[in-house]
């Protein structure tokens, strides 16, 4: 089980400083969609150069032109790139094909997919690397989370690894760990903490205990 730190509301220098605080406790750094919008793929390049030992995920949320966008993110140094589960199979296939060429990984984000079980089955057959249940900011504000959806994909997905994102904090992490996802994605649960390093360290300890 790995920890991914999601960075959304920072610029590149702030991102570098933040990762420095927690780098020994995390496995993947996510360059979130807002950062990509504000800074471009340069953010991926600079974080990968600053922390070559960490995997970098580019949260592009690809909906079309899968092959091309995977190629551009790969050139910037991304190790993992996101595609939306709500897109069509042709886009996912194009993304998977290009990712294999570039020796990169695809994470499919199931945000706003209505029938998680049936869509996860379809996507799992397309050769993606991760399938991720995700409660976005707007639904988190309504008190929702993806813990039940994680159970669904754990029971459904046979080939891809599983991931969960959205609203995970130190006090809710044990519930997530019980489901044994392969990747736990934490944003504000670390970035909003008074002591980011201590929080990330405790999360790593909890995960190690399983």
Q: Which residues fall in each region the model found?
A:
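Alpha-helix-loop-beta-strand connector modules within alpha/beta enzyme cores
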Residues: 37-61, 95-112, 144-170, 201-210
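Catalytic cores of alpha/beta
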Residues: 18, 64-76, 114-126, 156-158, ...
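Catalytic beta/alpha-barrel core
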Residues: 8, 28-36, 55-63, 79-90, ...
